[in-house]
Regions:
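Extracytoplasmic "Venus flytrap"
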Residues: 34-55, 74-80, 172-176, 306-312
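Extracellular/periplasmic periplasmic-binding protein-like sensory domains
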Residues: 190, 240-315, 329
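Soluble non-transmembrane domains of integral membrane proteins
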Residues: 344-346, 352-365, 372-379, 384-582
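Segments of small-molecule ligand-sensing domains
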Residues: 298-311, 322-378
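Channel- or pocket-lining gating/hinge segments that regulate access to a cavity or pore
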Residues: 582-701
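Extracellular/periplasmic Venus flytrap/periplasmic-binding protein
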Residues: 129-131, 137-245, 286-290, 294
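Beta-alpha junction/loop-to-helix N-cap segments that form part of ligand/metal-binding clefts
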Residues: 45-50, 60-133, 200-205
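Periplasmic-binding protein-like
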Residues: 35, 90-104, 123-125, 165-170, ...
Length: 719
């Protein structure tokens, strides 16, 4: 007996030692990643917002990919000198694989030469100055350049809005001057006349009469059919108010710095003043994919705040380092080379889209989207100009120009993308059929669009197995067309039954165009006009409403459709994406009926099994027969429960309850065999005492195990 105890202790100690080694190994396997943000001073709030995004991303990557990233956090106060000092501090750490951070371009420019000299790959989050990427081969920016933004603003202004006579206002700092110079150069080539130029100092407050002094003649001011403002958000806000006060009602176009909640705050600026104000943007939550939806939801849940638009880029920067490591690039040079090798065909799919860098300046190759400040939000404009990447687009240039799919400006081609707003309100869930992996629902569906080239009848529900729609109302005479339907049908869905019956199920309806891909049509969810009240009619009545969610995204079919142009180049298949819009309602299963219908019968079977302990240990045959009957009862009951559910390749929460029951009954059978051998050895009294002890322990232990299981699964299901 002593030898067995010593052996048991030795085995247990060995297991603990192995676990400790594994744990220590994981710690040593963690990759250290520098994160430099303004965590104090004027930009502290934004810096902490971005830091939370980086932490969330690192946690998700560790959970999903098993890659441990230890964030080494530093504060640069968004100041160039402090950024340089912090960069030197990080550069002295040989364990660091890379750096993410710096908010303004000025701070990034202060740190970039240090990173390049130390050969540390650095991803700057919001640096739009092209000189950041040109600082050296180890420095990249997650943003597009000021030059690209200004040129795309000019392209939209002349081709989409048909404006030719412009008032330009810019700040005198590098941000304003690079935007100004690039816009002026592009405007000159596009035939846009800059009727007047104004400049203001970035340092210090903007004079309250800046516009009134510079443009005193209200009558003369009516010559401008557009105003372009190249300034930071605080000055931009004041300039917009002063322009409106001076009677200038022309459209105003601002850079991405205007993506500030201040422009949506009626305490700071009226809705009348922001009418016809358009803003450039590298990313929009309204157009975000499912990753963006989950990130935004997790960010709100964990911080109680709305993520800053640059928080998405910060999260993507962490993802890019993880992607490099996942592909075997585990040192600085390999990671840098991986970043430099990325292109459209091999891009990393992130929250903000496909991630890859320009070769000439190592700035992120992003589209510049245009939004309108309307209804208290940055609303996607009905027309977007995007740059093509696929070879087949250039090959079919002449044909596509003739059809209006492309426009050519300044010897460059742009894709003309029509935006369609899609809204959907559920009013009845008729059935949730887990076995068929489908649900039946009724809802109102509507579309809003401007282009005559769009036929909304060709926008279909992608996951519908059977669906019908009846026209309710329409208005095709206005500039913004509108059509609404009442829909009813059955929709395919891949239910997640891992936590059944503690589960929540999302019931999505996904829409996409039948034939036009994302280079022609972009779907955006019309969340402004959707209802988010609970769905009252849900059948069968074992579900309760949780929430309603929506996202936009891209769906790629793994097919060339037989088009030879999609196979240009050896071994390459064009990435043909279709824009999709998804609206889903989340339901939670009511657990109370399952306590009586599922778990109570199982507990009754186990309770009856406990009474076997009341049978004298000498009556082995009777005890064994009853034990086998209990085992068969649990097995049949388990199979009966499973027959009502679909076949899946993983264990459900319900299965664990039956596993505990099997262990309980099998333990009892094993004890009966043990008791028989003891009785044959004429140790009846000692065996009966052990039997009585087990009778007192078994059922309370089972109840305790089931309680712990229930609490665990209920907690997991909530998160």
């Amino acid at each position: 007996m002593r030898i067995k105890r010593v052996s048991g202790v030795a085995v247990f100690s060995f297991m603990i030692a192995c676990c400790s080694l594994l744990f220590v190994g994981d710690l040593h396997a963690a990759y250290q990643l520098g994160v430099v943000l303004p965590l104090s001073g004027e930009f502290e709030k934004i810096g902490k917002n971005l830091l939370h995004a980086a932490e969330l991303s690192a946690e998700k990557i560790a959970r999903d990919k098993g890659i441990q990233l230890k964030l080494v956090v530093k504060d640069d106060k968004n100041e160039p000198r402090e950024a340089e000092r912090v960069a030197r501090e990080l550069a002295s750490d040989p364990a660091l694989i890379g750096v993410i951070g710096h908010y303004y371009s000025s701070a990034a420019l202060g740190a970039a030469p240090v990173y390049d000299a130390a050969r540390i790959p650095a991803l700057c989050i919001a640096a739009s100055d092209r000189n950041v990427g040109k600082s050296g081969p180890y420095v990249f920016s997650m943003y597009y350049s000021n030059e690209k933004q200004a040129e795309m603003m000019a392209a939209h202004l002349t081709r989409v809005f048909r404006k030719k006579n412009v008032l330009m206002i810019s700040s005198k700092d590098r941000f304003g001057t690079t935007l100004r110079d690039a816009f002026q150069a592009k405007a000159g080539r596009l035939g846009i006349r800059i009727a007047k130029r104004l400049e203001h100092d970035q340092a210090g407050p903007l004079a309250a009469d800046f516009i009134a002094s510079a443009l005193p003649d209200r009558r003369e001011n009516q010559q401008f059919d557009a105003v372009v403002v190249m300034s930071h958000a605080p000055q931009g806000l004041k300039l917009v108010k002063q322009l409106r006060k001076q009677g200038i009602r022309a459209m105003i176009m601002g850079p991405d710095s205007f993506n500030s909640p201040d422009f949506l705050d009626e305490r700071l600026i009226s809705e009348e003043d922001t009418k016809d104000v358009f803003v450039a943007s590298p990313f929009l939550w309204e157009m975000g994919n499912d990753r963006a939806l989950k990130f935004r939801r997790d960010f709100r849940r964990t911080s109680g705040q709305e993520p800053h638009i640059s928080a998405a880029a910060c999260s993507d920067a962490v993802l890019m380092f993880a992607s490099a490591i996942e592909k075997g690039n585990n040192d600085r040079k390999k990671i840098r080379d991986y970043f430099a090798s990325l292109k459209w065909q091999t891009a990393v799919s992130g929250i903000t889209g496909e991630l890859f860098f320009n070769k000439e300046d190592r700035m992120m190759d992003r589209d510049v989207f245009l939004t309108e400040i309307k209804d208290g939000r940055f609303k996607v404009n009905y027309v977007q100009l995007t740059e093509p990447h696929e070879p087949y687009v250039f090959k079919e240039k002449k044909e596509r120009l003739a059809k209006g799919y492309l426009v050519e400006l300044d010897n460059r081609i742009y894709q003309w993308v029509d935006v369609v707003f899609v809204g959907l309100d559920f009013f009845r869930i008729n059935d949730v059929n887990l076995q068929k992996m489908a649900f039946d629902a009724e809802f109102f569906l509507w579309f809003k669009w401007m282009s005559d080239k769009i036929n909304v009848e060709e926008i279909t529900i992608l996951n519908a197995s059977a669906s019908s729609r009846a026209l309710l109302k329409e208005d095709l005479g206005a500039s913004v067309k509108y059509r609404a339907y009442r829909c009813k049908g059955s929709y395919v869905n891949s239910f997640n039954l891992e936590y059944f019956p503690f589960d929540r199920q999302s019931l999505p309806v996904t829409l996409g165009h039948k034939s036009k891909n994302s280079t022609h049509v972009m779907l955006v969810v019309d969340s402004r006009h959707m209802a988010f009240d609970p769905v009252q009619e849900i059948y069968p009545q074992e579900w309760t409403y949780v929430n309603k969610e929506h996202d936009a995204g891209m769906h790629r079919f793994d097919s060339t459709y037989g088009d030879p142009d999609y196979r240009l180049g050896k071994g390459y298949k064009s990435k043909i994406y279709f824009s999709t819009a998804t609206v889903s309602v989340t339901l939670k299963r009511i657990i109370l009926p399952y306590l009586f219908n599922t778990f109570l019968p199982l507990l009754v079977i186990l309770l009856i099994t406990v009474f076997i302990f009341r049978i004298p240990v000498e009556q082995f045959a009777l005890r064994f027969n009853l034990s086998m009957t209990s085992l068969l009862s649990v097995l049949v009951y388990h199979l009966t429960q499973k027959s009502a559910l679909p076949r899946i390749g993983y264990l459900m929460a319900l299965d664990y309850y039956f596993i505990v029951a099997y262990m309980f009954v099998l333990t009892l059978i094993a004890f009966n065999v043990f008791a028989m051998t003891r009785v044959l050895e004429e140790k009846i009294e000692a065996t009966q005492q052990l039997n009585n002890l087990l009778m007192k322990i078994f059922f309370p232990a089972t109840i305790m195990v089931y309680t712990i299981l229930s609490a665990y699964f209920a907690m997991i299901a909530q998160t």
